[in-house]
């Protein structure tokens, strides 16, 4: 490792050895090992040494110029920072294999040189620590020491490689026009005048004009760029409608990156005088991309964000149905939740029955999961509502509002109003679930005791149910786990909705050979339409039920504190316990407070997790939660009843 005071001798040694790569590598190592505050001074020292030793400066610039003229540049231009063509699966396997058996690096290929120079994941730290002005100063000194003929030779080499890279990128973009996935999503790509193909024709003419130093009217070229960008955005949105796989999302992201790189290179080579600022910015992008070239975590983070967008988009579409904005929607939500409360009370009773007839923990957990899963599916099919299912949907809708609106006070007011609408909707849904589930449970317990003369639950079962809702006995932690499963069920629903669109489930089922034998055409089409529209919701509800039922079993088998508490089932169990145990009124109110606390944790955890994922998938963020909270307080101060009831809704 070289020291700053040994830098002059190091430069002389590398010049004598004719080792340009070693010179650049040593300089990068010196900058990498320097504290952040000393990185710029170290680069200033390098510039100072060259300025004050003309002979050394001329030797270094001649060495670097000759080295660059002998390198292949275009592989770096067309690949660095752009997703590979192999797809997510192939790229993941390549990066994992690279960890165990690194590939050979060719120091005559600038792409490999960048990887060797910037192989540390923290290299972005020192790259970003150097102002652009400092880099321009260093290259300015090197340029002054370079002879005119060498400058011309380097310029011609860079231009030749750059124009070739531009041609290759335009060919790639035009070739994607025939990708089966893109044609499935947008059949108009089959037209001969596709924007991708038209852009390629314009780029070919532009490159020919540049090689002949002819002025080129690029007005139509810019129109083609705009149309290609609009088409890619349209395809990304179309994916949420017709469904998209991870590979499709990966393809669209690569197409977008390729188009952006093409535009950047054309902006650099548009004239004979290259703007140093643009070249340096592009070089910085190459350096950061090289540092992340074999990063598995970076690939996973990038790729998972691609598919998350379409998943949360499907969740957001459902979320709009769970937000009430007038009295009609408010009472419809209440009646829907009340219907859900009826089935929840029966599901809780059946769970108690299962516990009394099944002793084996594994079979009991499986039976409880099936009880929950099929119960939630029936609730959904009857158009009833489970209150805590909505946050996973409404959070995605909230994130969409952040993306669609500009930043500022208007946005904060809209988000605050949306939060108030969501809170009111959740409140009435919880109220419908809790009141009806608890009331029906109490009625069933009363009728049972009246008919048999014995309470539905004995003292041991009552004590067990009270223990389950006590905040001091971990009920809030278990409620948080249920909130995580609520979040997961929303993601699962979104994924399978996307999958249904991607597979064109409607047409598959309508033309299924077996269904043709079993059902009439009318029934088959109706069944196909229903499954296509509700595929994700049915699977999401079933998976949510299984997760609830099996969590306690996993906790039992692993001896970990794992279980679930759900507000609706806790309220039903409280109804059975209250009548069986003849609770005193104050104690009963305390138990209701505990149940509502469980519901609050269910809602907060599921909403927060889904909002975080939705914001990330949309690549957006909320500037100030405090400002939104201030707007919420303003709304509550002006229209306090609108927080809970469908009144004072005039904006």
Where are these regions (language model features)?
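Alpha-helical transmembrane segments and their immediate juxtamembrane interface regions
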Residues: 336-339, 343, 347-350, 363-383, ...
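Hydrophobic alpha-helical transmembrane segments
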Residues: 272-289, 307-320, 369-380, 422-432, ...
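Soluble N-terminal domains of membrane-associated systems
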Residues: 1-311
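Catalytic cores of large soluble enzymes that bind and process phosphate-bearing ligands
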Residues: 220, 243, 247, 254, ...
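Long, compositionally biased intrinsically disordered regions
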Residues: 186, 211, 231-267, 278-297, ...
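Juxtamembrane/interface segments at transmembrane-helix termini
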Residues: 1-44, 49-55, 59-62, 357, ...
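Generic detector of multi-pass transmembrane helix bundles and their immediately adjacent loops
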Residues: 374, 389-391, 400-569
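Core alpha-helical transmembrane segments of integral membrane proteins
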Residues: 312-410, 430-450
């Amino acid at each position: 490792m070289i020291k700053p005071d040994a830098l002059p001798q190091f430069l002389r040694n590398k010049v004598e050895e004719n080792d340009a790569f070693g010179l650049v590598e040593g300089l990068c190592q010196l900058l990498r090992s320097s504290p952040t505050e000393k990185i710029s001074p170290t680069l200033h020292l390098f510039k100072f040494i060259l300025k004050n030793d003309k002979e050394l400066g001329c030797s270094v610039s001649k060495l670097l110029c000759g080295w660059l003229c002998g390198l292949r540049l275009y592989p770096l231009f067309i690949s660095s920072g752009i997703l590979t063509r192999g797809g997510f699966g192939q790229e993941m396997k390549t990066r994992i294999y690279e960890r165990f058996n690194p590939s050979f690096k060719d120091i005559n290929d600038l792409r490999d040189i960048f990887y060797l120079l910037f192989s540390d994941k923290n290299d972005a730290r020192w790259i970003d620590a150097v102002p652009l002005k400092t880099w321009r100063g260093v290259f300015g000194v090197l340029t002054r020491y370079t002879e005119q003929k060498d400058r011309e030779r380097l310029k011609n080499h860079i231009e030749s490689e750059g124009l070739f890279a531009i041609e290759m990128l335009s060919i790639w973009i035009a070739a994607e026009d025939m990708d089966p996935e893109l044609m499935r999503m947008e059949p108009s790509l089959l037209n001969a005048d596709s924007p991708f193909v038209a852009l390629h024709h314009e780029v070919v003419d532009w490159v020919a004009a540049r090689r002949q130093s002819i002025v080129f009217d690029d007005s139509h070229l810019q129109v083609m760029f705009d149309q290609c960008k609009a088409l890619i955005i349209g395809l990304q949105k179309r994916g949420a409608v017709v469904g998209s796989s991870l590979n499709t999302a990966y393809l669209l992201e690569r197409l977008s990156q390729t188009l952006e790189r093409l535009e950047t290179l054309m902006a650099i080579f548009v004239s004979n005088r290259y703007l140093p600022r643009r070249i340096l910015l592009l070089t910085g992008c190459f350096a950061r991309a090289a540092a992340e070239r074999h990063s598995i975590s970076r690939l996973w983070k990038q790729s998972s964000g691609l598919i998350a967008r379409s998943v949360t988009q499907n969740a957001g579409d459902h979320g709009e149905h769970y937000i009430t904005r007038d009295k009609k929607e408010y009472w419809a939500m209440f009646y829907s939740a009340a219907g859900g409360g009826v089935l929840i009370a029966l599901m809780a009773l059946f769970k108690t029955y299962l516990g009394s007839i099944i002793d084996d923990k594994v079979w009991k957990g499986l039976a409880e999961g099936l009880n929950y899963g099929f119960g939630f599916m029936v609730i959904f099919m009857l158009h009833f509502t489970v209150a805590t299912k909505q946050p996973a949907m409404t959070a995605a809708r909230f994130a969409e509002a952040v993306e669609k609106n500009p930043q500022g006070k208007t946005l904060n007011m809209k988000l605050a109003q949306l939060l108030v609408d969501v809170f009111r909707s959740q409140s009435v849904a919880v109220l419908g679930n809790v009141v009806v589930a608890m009331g029906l449970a109490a009625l069933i317990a009363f009728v049972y005791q009246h008919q048999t003369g014995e309470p539905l639950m004995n003292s041991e079962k009552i004590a067990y149910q009270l223990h389950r809702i006590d905040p001091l006995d971990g009920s809030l932690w278990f409620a948080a786990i249920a909130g995580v499963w609520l979040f997961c069920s929303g993601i699962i629903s979104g994924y399978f909705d996307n999958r249904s669109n991607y597979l064109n489930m409607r047409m598959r089922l309508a033309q299924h050979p077996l269904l043709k034998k079993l059902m009439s055409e009318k029934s088959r089409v109706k069944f196909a339409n229903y499954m296509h529209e509700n595929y994700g919701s049915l699977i999401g509800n079933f998976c949510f039920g299984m997760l609830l039922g099996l969590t306690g079993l996993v906790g039992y088998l692993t001896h970990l504190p794992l279980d679930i508490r759900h507000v609706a089932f806790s309220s039903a169990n409280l109804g059975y316990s209250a009548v069986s145990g003849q609770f005193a009124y104050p104690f009963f109110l305390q138990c209701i407070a505990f149940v509502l606390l469980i519901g609050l944790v269910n809602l907060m955890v599921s909403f927060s997790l889904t909002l975080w994922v939705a914001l990330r998938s949309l690549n957006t963020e909320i500037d100030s939660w405090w400002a939104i909270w201030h707007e919420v307080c303003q709304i509550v101060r002006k229209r306090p009843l609108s927080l809970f009831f469908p009144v004072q809704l005039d904006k």
